[in-house]
Amino acid sequence: MKAAYDCRATKRACSDRKVLILGTNWANPQSGTMEKITISIVNDKATGNKRNIEEEADESPPPKKLRSAVFLCSTPSSAPHCSRDVDVFDEFDDTILERSEDESDSPLHMTLVQIEELLEGDSDYAAEPPGWEEESDTVLQELAVPNADGSQRNIVEFRNLNSPLVEEQSDSSHTLTEETVCSQDTSNYAAMAPSPCWSSISTAEQNGEAGDNVLSVCPITSPVLHKNEVNRGSVQDCSEVCNDSDICSTLSSSHLPGDLKVVDEISEDSDIPFDGDIDELLTLSPGDTTSEDEDNKITSESTPASSELESVPLVHSHTEAIYKTPSSLQCPVTFTASTDPSNLSQLSVSSVTAINGQNNSNKVPLPPSDTAPGPQLPADPCSQSSKVLKVEPKENKVIKETGFEQGEKSCAAPLDHTVKENLGQTSKEQVVVSIGCKKKVKPSQLQQKKLGTLPTKPQAACRPQISNAELEKNRNIYRDRVMMHLEVHNIPGEPNYELATLLNETSRENPTWQHPSDYTRRNYYVRKQPVPCSLNDWVMRNGGPAIERFHGLPCTFQRSPMPGVLPTGPS
């Protein structure tokens, strides 16, 4: 490439320059090979002033805008969660774009109109799935419940629809028909009721043995879908289907394990179409029939049915739990074990008989028991306690054991004991049975820890005491042996012998002279320390100033300016 600069001689020197781009062949540039482009370069630093730049308008059309594909979900309710740029999706305008033959609006090769039609079809499919009538016919079951007069009446199980429809149906009707469901706005998918789930199922066998006119269906917290009644044209009122006295016994019997199995079978056999959304699947909870708040509310209500069940003598509560058959009445009654020692009292035979006489009027049958009522231990305590230990709480063992020992002395108890006192009586017997099974095994003597004796403390070594007579005797023996040794080796010409003889004689004759052997470490403390003296005193003792011993040393020390040169002496 070759660039030619055309500089203008103006006040702004070298401020405006034009660049001409030519072809690759510098010698013979061919016209038409490249488009002539004029570039204006402005250098404002020459003058420091701003100037307007005339820019050429871009005549070429703008490039095609890239459209980011936004995929909407199959249901309108989950669209805000799946598409983040819904507003941007509506702002795109492709009217100025020219569509080619091989070009489409989306990677799915579908136009915008087709996508909208597909979404509308999905919402209709989700709102009204096919097979709604068939599914409701197969899932809803009719239960035969005996009436007071012995006739049978068909009652349709209800569905628990956890939706805003519950608040709308809280009036006197408490029923929900198929027409009201179809009349709702099907376009608003979020406002629709979730998938139905069974809330309670009862069997006619349990109600038959109970002997009470209790209906298996009682729509309290959720509306009831009476489809068969709508077809017949006679919708029964909720007050006729069930009354307030049958609420607790009916719903409490729906918490049984047998009912849960029926719920699982119905939920597995149901043919509910899947519309591609998991919001409906998350609401399916057949196992959780009722919430904990409903259970607490039901047990707290004082109804005739629950009061009759609580008045059952609790002496047979243990045997009833063991010999209970599937055909017997299964109604969970919650009791609270009393941990107060004062409430742990025995029941006599007369009191138990009186309580049984009062309960004979109840319609709840008691299972047969071979043993007489009262605080009697079973024949096989170990086998009986294996079942008791699973139910008995651990915190009442110590208190109940002491209460049983005190209860053996008492032979009568008042008849106005509460239910909690009777429960304490029964649980106390169970604990005693479990205690009787345990055999106390004494630890063997081999396992007992033997106390060992501590080792004797070593006594401090004392210095041996030698008498003076014995010491003198040993000294003489040692000296005689040394002298004998010297006499044997007595040679006059030996220099060591002569030196030793001289030192011995000198030390004996001159007491001021000390033997060299006394200067050893053994006799060092015997020497007299010399008296310290000053330097002048030491000079006077050693000859005085007449001795020219320190002649030449200066009175004051002067450092030599050069090393190796001694300072000059005094003149």
UniProtKB/Swiss-Prot annotation:
UniProt keywords (A-Z) are: Nucleus
Its chief place of residence is: nucleus
* Record localization: Nucleus
Q: Is Nucleus given among the entry's keywords?
A: yes
Give the domain of life. Eukaryota
Q: What one GO molecular function would you report for this record?
A: calcium-dependent protein binding
Q: Region annotation Disordered: residue ranges?
A: 270-312, 356-385
- Compositional bias, Pro residues, is annotated for 365-378
Residue stretches of biased makeup (Acidic residues): 270-280
| Comp. bias intervals (Polar residues) | 299-309
Keyword Metal-binding listed? The answer is no
- GO annotation, cellular component aspect: nucleus
Q: Which InterPro entries match?
A: S100PBP
What name does UniProt use for this protein? S100P-binding protein
- Protein's organism: Xenopus tropicalis (Western clawed frog)
